[in-house]
């Protein structure tokens, strides 16, 4: 099975929460910490991402979130 996970740039995140709402697996949460721009930012809960990309596509900030999907040993991303 492929392992997917979001990578969040805490400096670029503006706490709009669109990614949290868009995530069907509810694996994102708002951090209690504040970034250098004065916003709380989104954090990954650590497991459960299915790699759907909803968070990436709904985020208005270009560099705030990416979804990484690890490749299998044969180089494919299908489990």
UniProtKB/Swiss-Prot annotation:
The protein's required cofactors: [4Fe-4S] cluster
Keywords assigned: 4Fe-4S, Electron transport, Iron, Iron-sulfur, Metal-binding, Oxidoreductase, Repeat, Transport
Keyword Oxidoreductase on entry: yes
Enzyme Commission code(s) on record: 1.2.7.7
Top-level taxon of origin: Archaea
Binding residues annotated for [4Fe-4S] cluster 2, in chain numbering: 23, 49, 52, 55
Keyword Metal-binding: yes
Enzymatic reactions: 3-methyl-2-oxobutanoate + 2 oxidized [2Fe-2S]-[ferredoxin] + CoA = 2-methylpropanoyl-CoA + 2 reduced [2Fe-2S]-[ferredoxin] + CO2 + H(+)
One family name in Pfam for this protein: Fer4_7
Domain (4Fe-4S ferredoxin-type) ranges: 4-33, 40-70
GO MF annotation, one: 3-methyl-2-oxobutanoate dehydrogenase (ferredoxin) activity
Residue numbers binding [4Fe-4S] cluster 1: 13, 16, 19, 59
Note on cofactor: Binds 2 [4Fe-4S] clusters.
Subunit structure: Heterotrimer of the VorA, VorB and VorC subunits.
Record-given protein name: Ketoisovalerate oxidoreductase subunit VorC
Organism in which the protein naturally occurs: Methanothermobacter thermautotrophicus (strain ATCC 29096 / DSM 1053 / JCM 10044 / NBRC 100330 / Delta H) (Methanobacterium thermoautotrophicum)
């Amino acid at each position: 099975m492929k392992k997917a996970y979001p990578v969040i740039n805490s400096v670029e995140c503006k706490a709009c929460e669109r990614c949290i709402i868009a995530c069907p697996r509810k694996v994102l949460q708002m951090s209690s910490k504040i970034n250098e721009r004065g916003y709380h930012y989104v954090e990954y809960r650590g497991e459960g991402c299915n790699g759907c990309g909803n968070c990436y596509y709904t985020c208005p900030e270009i560099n705030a979130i990416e979804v990484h999907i690890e490749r299998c040993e044969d180089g494919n991303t299908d489990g």
